[in-house]
């Protein structure tokens, strides 16, 4: 029987890479999001079960946690807009609280949280603080979660991130921002998947 993982944020920039790699590794992958399957449709999408659901309404998706080996939270926003209720507290903290609470109720062995490395804390202080609050909540519920802290993701689909990568190289040449190392999104997704698989093998569950 294949291991089942339930992913939130699976049709995002990072999430699509992650669910694709996980399905290629033989996992039963379920992605929950408001939109369901990404558009336009690609061949690999057939290997993933795309479920429409509101993350703020657990009744939409909690039954999916039955017999799951892992729940993966890769939802998050780096820029907030309080006028539309898109705040760090709501999307980076409250969603983590909802998911980890439901995962614990269903006794899901592994909880994976995509946090963030504070690469430019002086510019995004509130963002990184929200990620830390989410981590604290998760660790209070799951004594041994898998928390990943990547740097900024870059990829060819997002032109803005490519520009950031080029500017970073220039800054490094000048001896600036040495701690800031943008990470290819494909590399990051593979790293998270590898760490999750290792956790499954060693049975270091929450």
Please identify what each model-predicted range represents:
Residues 10, 34, 116, 155:
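Cofactor-binding loop segments of dinucleotide-utilizing enzymes, especially the Rossmann-like FAD-
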Residues 28, 85, 90-135, 141, ...:
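Conserved Rossmann-fold NAD(P)-dependent oxidoreductase catalytic core, especially the SDR/UDP-sugar
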